[in-house]
Amino acid sequence: MRHVAVIIPARYGASRFPGKPLADLAGKPLIAHVVERAQRARGVDVVAVATDDDRIARAARDAGGQAILTGPAATGTDRVAEAARKLAPRPEIVVNLQGDEPLIEPEAIEAVIGAMEAGVRMATLARPLAAGELERTQVVKVVTRASGDALYFSRAPIPHRRAGGESPLARAHVGIYAFTAAFLETFTALAPGRLEGEEALEQLRALEHGYDIRVADTGYRGFGIDTPDDLERARALLAAGA
């Protein structure tokens, strides 16, 4: 088995919700929930938080994870790549898990790791679309080849269904990524793409430069904390047993 690291990028100064990783959720910092759930995933050798903030680093260690202090980074993926270089031993597979997903299901992490067993360089997840989601720009859609590799990701409703109604071929993207350590370095060295800029979707950089992304299925719907209202909803879901 290859050495697998889950690296969670987290910064204090989020514009919409400053201090989000340290926000209290059921008696512990939000970032602690992400660390603890990632540790429950099978096949994970190390869970680390990549951050430029000592307070977040302390919370990560208190939750049982590693903390890696990084410099200023343009994107979370850049922060993950820097952290991966600092880990010893160096991981062979790196999972980029967002630090605002306190309800992440360990099975979703296992699914994206499992997709890498086919020898691919990069993988992500998708789930069935719920009713009405096809038209929502906040929900990123993905269509794939027969091989399971992504053809395109878009905020637009893809594919268009000539017969009308929502296409059964459309799926919702779930933003968890796995990379080989070597391809993570390649990816972060690539110039941002034009379509990436138009859609504001970083994963399009790989497709624009001719690299494949394997897309695996998951039942996890994804739930990121972007606002204090989202945090209240997460509190309710945890209280209900999520």
Curated annotation (Swiss-Prot):
Protein family per UniProt: Belongs to the KdsB family.
Organism: Anaeromyxobacter dehalogenans (strain 2CP-1 / ATCC BAA-258)
Listed GO biological process terms: CMP-keto-3-deoxy-D-manno-octulosonic acid biosynthetic process; lipopolysaccharide biosynthetic process
Superkingdom, taxonomy of origin: Bacteria
Protein name stated in the entry: 3-deoxy-manno-octulosonate cytidylyltransferase
UniProt entry keywords in alphabetical sequence: Cytoplasm, Lipopolysaccharide biosynthesis, Nucleotidyltransferase, Transferase
GO molecular-function term, one example from the UniProt record: 3-deoxy-manno-octulosonate cytidylyltransferase activity
PANTHER family named among the record's database cross-references: 3-DEOXY-MANNO-OCTULOSONATE CYTIDYLYLTRANSFERASE, 3-DEOXY-MANNO-OCTULOSONATE CYTIDYLYLTRANSFERASE, MITOCHONDRIAL
HAMAP family: KdsB
Gene (UniProt): kdsB
Example of a GO cellular component annotation carried by this entry: cytosol
SUPFAM superfamilies in alphabetical order: Nucleotide-diphospho-sugar transferases
Function: Activates KDO (a required 8-carbon sugar) for incorporation into bacterial lipopolysaccharide in Gram-negative bacteria.
Keyword Nucleotidyltransferase part of the UniProt annotation: yes
InterPro entries per UniProt: Cytidylyl_trans (IPR003329), KdsB (IPR004528), Nucleotide-diphossugar_trans (IPR029044)
Compartments where located: Cytoplasm
Entry keyword Iron-sulfur: no
Reaction equations catalysed: 3-deoxy-alpha-D-manno-oct-2-ulosonate + CTP = CMP-3-deoxy-beta-D-manno-octulosonate + diphosphate
E.C. numbers: 2.7.7.38
Pfam families per record: CTP_transf_3 (PF02348)
Major subcellular location class: cytoplasm
Annotated metabolic or biological route of this protein: Nucleotide-sugar biosynthesis; CMP-3-deoxy-D-manno-octulosonate biosynthesis; CMP-3-deoxy-D-manno-octulosonate from 3-deoxy-D-manno-octulosonate and CTP: step 1/1; Bacterial outer membrane biogenesis; lipopolysaccharide biosynthesis
